[in-house]
Amino acid sequence: MAEILVKNARIDGAVTDVLLSGRTVSRIAPAIPAPPDAAVIDARGGVVIPGFVDCHSHIDKSHLMDGGRAKYVHGTGAVKGGLTRVEKAAFTVEDIYKRAEAVVKTAIASGTLFLRTNCDVDGYVGLKGIEALTALREKYKDDITIQIAAFAQEGVFQDDKTQGLLNDAMRMGADLVGGHTITFGEGERHIDFILDLAAKDGVEADFHLDESGNRENY
């Protein structure tokens, strides 16, 4: 098992050493002798903290303005949503993978160990995002834990495809199912579908609770 000794690390204000055995912190103490073949890093008094947790992201729709793509403008949510749908219809699995991978690499380099991302599942993008993100999750599984929420961004009952697609997304490896509390007037019907699907598959449900801007809706 590979070992790493971090010397002169600052934890809770005190300078100490940290010994890592594989992915586990095996010892924290001053002046730990370096085990044979251990890699030694001098933290030089830098702060050592647990890895970061990113509990809400949408990496399937990241970097949409890169490379001369969509030129988003200030406007209403409806306008921005319409622009996003135009983009989503043109997504490919490879395109989503490349853009999402850039986010994952940045997250790892910044000390993030856990990332939960929504992934749109609807009649515009289909299951392309799920295919891309499950492959990405597998590639980086030793560096970061990625949870994928099959997300009903465009509602559940706005077409005749989304309900089946959400079920298919769970079969393809989505970790949980996501929805809105207020989406296209679907109301409790939307919430009930998401909760029922989560219960059927024994997974968590992840809801956006703040989409309308009207406190009476809560």
List PLM regions with ranges:
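Histidine-rich, glycine-flanked metal-binding segment
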Residues: 1-5, 10-49
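Divalent metal-coordination and catalytic microenvironments
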Residues: 9, 23, 45, 56, ...
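Di-metal (Zn2+ and/or Mg2+/Mn2+) metal-binding site signature of metallo-dependent hydrolases
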Residues: 46-68, 211-212
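Hydrophobic faces of well-ordered beta-strands that scaffold small-molecule active sites
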Residues: 51-55, 115-117, 144-150, 177-179, ...
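Active-site gating loops and adjacent loop-to-helix segments of metal-dependent hydrolytic enzymes
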Residues: 63-96, 173, 197, 201-203
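Divalent metal-binding segments
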Residues: 76-127, 181-183, 189
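Active-site-proximal loop/turn and secondary-structure-junction residues that shape catalytic pockets
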Residues: 121-123, 150-155, 183, 211-213
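Histidine/acidic residue-rich metal-binding segments in metalloenzymes
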Residues: 128-142, 158-218
